[in-house]
Amino acid sequence: MERKQRKVYQGRVVSDKMDKTITVVVETKRNHPVYGKRINYSKKYKAHDENNSAKTGDIVRIMETRPLSKDKHFRLVEIVEEAVII
């Protein structure tokens, strides 16, 4: 039996306060069904970060995986861009 293609999202880390868990906001744009205007949507996902390497503000790529907890169904694949600390 062949495994399904897993979803991969890119987003920004908004929280890294939990141990081995990050919260990532993924923003998408869609057209309104009636008026056709482009609307921004955002959704938060909790992702597993084994080494606690991602920090708040980083741009990361996450991949769908088996359920790791009640809310956690994604894991960190890579850190695309690190946040600039001022």
UniProtKB/Swiss-Prot annotation:
GO terms for cellular component: cytosolic small ribosomal subunit. The keyword tRNA processing does not apply. InterPro entries: NA-bd_OB-fold, Ribosomal_uS17, Ribosomal_uS17_bact/chlr, Ribosomal_uS17_CS. Keywords: Ribonucleoprotein, Ribosomal protein, RNA-binding, rRNA-binding. One of its GO terms (biological process) is translation. GO terms for molecular function: rRNA binding; structural constituent of ribosome. PROSITE patterns: RIBOSOMAL_S17. HAMAP family: Ribosomal_uS17_B (MF_01345_B). One of the primary rRNA binding proteins, it binds specifically to the 5'-end of 16S ribosomal RNA. Part of the 30S ribosomal subunit. Belongs to the universal ribosomal protein uS17 family. This is Small ribosomal subunit protein uS17. It comes from Lactococcus lactis subsp. cremoris (strain MG1363).
